[in-house]
Structures are given as C-alpha cells and as structure tokens.
C-alpha cells in the first residue's frame, strides 16, 4: 500500500542543486572560511576520502531522473527537544553559506570508558542547554557562550557506571532524564529544581514534552508519562524487556493526541496521549541478517512523525513508514540504522549501519541516491570504525558529524560531497541548528557554536 502525499502542510519548493559548500577547518582555536571552489588549493593535512564503496544499498534506476525538490529553508527559533521538536520533523532549516566559529564552552565531563555523552544540546531563544556524561546540566548564552548556570544532578549514593539520559525544554522549564533513575524539572532561568520523579529504572534517552506531559522511556522498556507542573505520573506503558541493546535509547515522538514510543525490543507503538490506549503496534525485529549484531532489534534512531506518516528504523535492518492514525503500512524497506531519519518535502535522508547516506522517496521508500561514507579512520587496515551522527538538513546541505573528528557536508539533491569540517575532537551526538547557528558537542565535552 502506498499512501498519498499529505497536503496539510503547505510547502514552497526549490529546484536543482545549489553549489553551496560546508568546508570548514577547525583546529584548536582556529577556524578557516567555508569554501568549495575547484580552483582553490587543498587544505594541508590528512584526507579521508569518500570511498567508492559498493556494498549494500543501490539507487533505483527507474527514478534516476526524478528531480529532488526541497522546502525553502526557514529560521527555527528553537531546537527545544531531541530531534528539534516533539514530532522530530524539522524539514529544511536556515544556515548561512559561510558560518564561522563564534564561541566554544566546556559542558563538563566528556565521553570515556565509563560514561558517554548521550544528550543533544537544546536551544530555546537565547539559551543553549547541555548535559555532560555525568548529569551535569549547564545553560549558556547563545550569543557569546557565557555560562548562566550549572547544576549537578548526579546521585552521589549510586555506583559508578550510571550515565545517559537527556534534556528537553518547554516554556519556563527544563526537563532532565538521568541514568540515576530520576526525572527533574528545573527552572529554565536559574537551574533551581522544581520537582523530582523517581523512575523504576535508569534512562538512556531524553524526555519529550507535549501538551503538559513529559514522556520518557526507561532502560527496562517502560514509558512514563508525567505532569509537567507537578511530576506526578499520569500513566505508564510497559513494553517487552530486552537483555541486549545498544548504548543509548530513542525518545518518543508526539503529534496531535498520539505518542509513538520505540523500545529496545524492536517494538514501535502508537498510543493515545490521554490514557495510553494502543492505536497500533509494529515490530522491527523480524528481518534476519547474517551479522549477529543485527539481531539487536533496538529502535535507536528517533522515530519521526512527518505530516501523519510515522518513520521508524531499527538496528536489525528494517525501516517502516506507517500511517499515524490507522497504522496501515505505506511501505517497508530492508535498511538498518541507529540515527534519526530526516524528512523534508517528498524525500527522507538517513545514515545506515553500513556507512551509507541514503535519499529515499517519501511516498514509496524507493532509493533516489546513495553516497558511501568513510567507515574506518584506517580503511586499509579497517581499524578505528567511524560512527556518523545525523543527518541535519540546513542551508541546502546535509550535515553529518563523525566520531573521528570530521563533519561532512553532502548535497541533498544528488548526494555529492561538498566538503568537511576538521574538528579537534569527534562528535558525541548529532549536530543541532537553531537561529541560523550550528551547535556541536564533542566527545571531549566541548560545545561549539558556529554562525
């Protein structure tokens, strides 16, 4: 079954490939211009090429002549939740063609052997909020990066090894889920604790906030729904427990009166936000793969609700597009990934487990183009695997950040690489964009702002 393209949200389209570049060198404290002209001399230093890697997915030759059209970029004032909004659908964001590094700040403890940074930064108006690998939450001025407040939410009575969680902001509150099995509501202006809710188990993903409710998923596959004003539990849903899983977890997606919750078991369910009644359920764990790791069916990438179409992808190699209201499948594809798909107009962009950046048609899941990405720092020896975060569509380019210290820019129209950022450290989480600014958090615990 193929669903028609919903027409509820008006879109203005732009045709063709725009030759914009995302080539920026960041080394220590220095940053060069973004460039892309063929006649310019190359920057010094080691290059990691976009490989001619033929394993995996292929573009559909029958749609090779389809012109990729995108909505016009718009300025989003906020990136207040994981994925940008409660529905995780941000479309095409505005970002200048030549952003410069304007400031950087220390968010706290970075990723290491014991704890990892899992929280995306969130941006609301003139403030950026972050959380480090040990539940240290900070607020920074978005214009110059000065710290406004900082609060340590680590539970001193707990053993080492409890980390993860994330943050979301709504109105005058910041909501924090921690690996210490606590959900906090903080005053957005001061960091003062307003309420604390003790969860039944730790959390590895960020909360999502919508219509007076906080939605958060625990490590043992329960979704808690809390009142934003009091922290009181309104209802909860219990999924199938899973003993094996990936680091981190996906946040639910919310639109209208429906929440789509992903679990590490591969379950994806649509529930009514009022009382938790099930609208429909799917399982993304039944594609059999030769790779034993693919047996982990976890839905690690955030599900997306794009104009009443739910997009969900699992690590086990299955992607579904499902009607939000009826639960009817629009299409399914044998594609695995752990990053959030990015929806824009008639197309969907995603990074696969096999290190490919893919453009799909929204209406039927057919592949318009595929770009192989570097998979190892040392490709010849296949050592030091690269983990890619993203993509984000901003300023007519797809931006993906690597764990090896480079950020790539790729054309959304044909998949051709446009350039790279050479960071001094790898990206811990996917980049975020708000108010014409790009924000990156590194494994070393640095927040970098470019505009």
What are these regions (language model features)?
Residues 25-28:
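C-terminal motif of bacterial Sec signal peptides marking the signal peptidase cleavage site
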Residues 30-33:
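Bacterial signal peptide processing site
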Residues 102-122, 150-168, 195-210, 233-255, ...:
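Extracytoplasmic beta-rich repeat domains
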Residues 138, 184, 224, 269, ...:
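WD40 beta-propeller blade core
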